[in-house]
Structure formats: structure tokens, C-alpha cells
């Protein structure tokens, strides 16, 4: 009887450990993707300055100056924030 209970316990551990490890891997992957997304977002506004604002019609307008970049525009910051920003 004790041998059967011990064997069931070992089987239970073998089943639980791999599934909990997979959940940790998924969380680590999500954190890595989020960090990469916000890092890219921050890089796109570096070296940019100007007056960029949302008009009454909802469009972003203003003047932007990007040092070291040939293309600079005033546009939506990103879909989580409804503001406007200069991007290069």
C-alpha cells in the first residue's frame, strides 16, 4: 500500500514540475517582449523636439526637429496614450 502511494506521489511530481516550468518560460517571454517594445518606443523619440499637439479635429499637428535624422513627423504617441509626440 505504501509503495503504491509513493509511486503515485512520484508520478504526480513528474507531472506537476514540467507544467510549472512551462508557465515560468511563458512569463519570462512576455517580460522580454514587453521590454523590447518599450525600448523601441523610447528610441524612436530620441533626439526629437518641437511643439506637437492634438487639434480639435483629433489630428496631431506641430513642428518637429530631429537632430541626426532625415525624417521627422508629429504623430500619435502610441495606442495606450492618446497624446502626440515627435518621432524620427
UniProtKB/Swiss-Prot annotation:
GO terms for cellular component: extracellular region. Keywords: Disulfide bond, Neurotoxin, Secreted, Signal, Toxin. GO terms for molecular function: toxin activity. The keyword Disulfide bond applies. Residues 22-46 form a propeptide. Residues 1-21 form the signal peptide. Contains 5 disulfide bonds. Expressed by the venom duct. It is found in: Secreted. It comes from the Eukaryota. The cysteine framework is VIII (C-C-C-C-C-C-C-C-C-C). Belongs to the conotoxin S superfamily. This is Conotoxin Ca8a. It comes from Conus caracteristicus (Characteristic cone).
